[in-house]
């Protein structure tokens, strides 16, 4: 079992992620990669952190909650034996993903609770992961 973590910083109205602007995908070190490339699990968590950070900022602005800064962290449990085909019992993909926020704010606990509730509600990546949309594999043009 490996723990994959991504963390980004809240700065102004932007979200600065630890990822790279141009991303080259490769194998995770636990599957034979050298660690210099982003694995798909890294990119999934980076997308969640970025979306949650931007959404949190937008919701905070809408609710007039001042956020001076903070961090957004996503971490997930991934058993690489599944994706490597080593164990048929090991699932392919994350078993659990946890999203955490450390906020520098004078907001009340009630305001923070509302902020996080609405961030979950309006974060596209969070809702996509939570809802498990229909996903199809195809060859050629995906069409409608």
Model-derived features: where do they sit?
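Extended beta-strand/beta-hairpin segments
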Residues: 1-46, 58-144
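Classical protein tyrosine phosphatase
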Residues: 55
């Amino acid at each position: 079992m490996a723990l994959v973590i991504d963390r980004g910083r809240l700065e102004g109205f932007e979200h600065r992620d630890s990822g790279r602007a141009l991303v080259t995908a490769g194998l995770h070190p636990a599957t034979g990669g050298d660690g210099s490339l982003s694995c798909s699990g890294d990119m999934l968590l980076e997308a969640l952190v970025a979306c949650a950070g931007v959404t949190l900022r937008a919701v905070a602005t809408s609710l007039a909650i001042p956020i001076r800064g903070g961090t957004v962290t996503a971490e997930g449990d991934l058993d690489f034996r599944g994706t490597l085909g080593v164990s048929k019992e090991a699932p392919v993909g994350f078993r659990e993903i946890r999203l955490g926020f450390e906020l520098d704010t004078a907001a009340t606990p009630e305001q923070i609770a509302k902020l996080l509730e609405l961030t979950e509600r309006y974060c596209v990546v969070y809702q996509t992961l939570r809802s498990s949309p229909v996903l199809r594999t195809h060859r050629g043009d995906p069409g409608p």
